Amino acid sequence: PQVESCVVVRRIEKRTAMKAGRDFWWDDVLAPEAPQCEPERMGANDPLFILYTSGSTAKPKGILHGTGGYLLYATLTSKYVFDLKEHDIFWCTADAGWITGHSYLVYGPLSNGTTSLMFEGVPNFPKPDRFWEIVEKFGVNILYTAPTAVRSMMKDGDRWVNEHDISTLRLLGSVGEPITSKAWMWYYSTVGHGMCPIVDTWWQTETGGIMITSIPGAVDMKPGSAALPFFGIEPRVIGADGAEADAGERGSLVLTRPWPGMMLGVYGNAKAHKDVYFPTPGYYLTGDGAY
């Protein structure tokens, strides 16, 4: 596929250079359309989207996800990891252009009938209480954000949190990188007032959804630990020799069974799909270390 047209949202009062025949205003495109339309029926393995990721190195790879498996996995992980209810206000602070935004800002919450809050901006502008102002204003029940944001808000101090009534929060989530024990404890005690479970989640663009996590009310929490595999996920740690590592021994994190949300492949590069992710038969190589 290739991009042939660009639909532009009139977001700010600024002159935009538009190319006739290629660029179209969002409101002009929508104006003649009905507010509702019948959904298009798709096959389970029809492509749903391509997201480009490079990890920490290497050339960006177009990760291709399918319709049926991805949607199923985004729906189930949203439901059980976040204990979603239809009346919840769910706030995933990720950008919609990344996999976290795809799975837990758009597809996951909406497929469960939950209200999803979309945010544009940064946590500390115009003031360091921006997040807590939004939580209070909209009655957010579940907050899913990155450790980087947690550390930044922790640095700003407790008073910015305490100035707002954020008692509607009932569950907190962490995504994107390991969260330190210090940041975890601040998140739990200051933001959650010691009452909100924290789900520390590990997953990747390629996996489509959460793979390792605690389940609120079912799995004990441990600061700095993503806890246990999600239902049906079987991870292992292997050493440089390809053998399974002993308890406490560092190695490479691999997955030994397929799951619904796994990517269909690397778009246009079947060789990279095999060489990068399946160099050892029977294992999906995550590229992450573990012990």
Listing of model-derived features with the role each one plays in the protein:
Residues 71-89, 99-142, 156:
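Conserved AMP-binding/adenylation subdomain of ANL enzymes
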Residues 39-42, 220-229, 244, 280-282:
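Short Gly/Pro-enriched turn/cap motifs at secondary-structure boundaries
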Residues 47, 53-56, 78, 90, ...:
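Conserved S/T- and glycine-rich ATP-binding loop of Class I adenylate-forming
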Residues 95, 176, 203, 227, ...:
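Active-site glycine-centered loops adjacent to acidic/histidine catalytic or metal-binding residues
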Residues 27, 111-114, 141-145, 154-221, ...:
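Gly/Ser/Thr-rich phosphate-binding loop
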Residues 1, 62-64, 115-123, 199:
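Short beta-strand->loop structural element characteristic of the AMP-binding/adenylate-forming
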Residues 3-8, 19-52, 59, 69, ...:
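Conserved pre-ATP/AMP-binding loop-to-beta segment of ANL
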Residues 246-248, 254-291:
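Conserved ATP-binding/catalytic segment of the ANL
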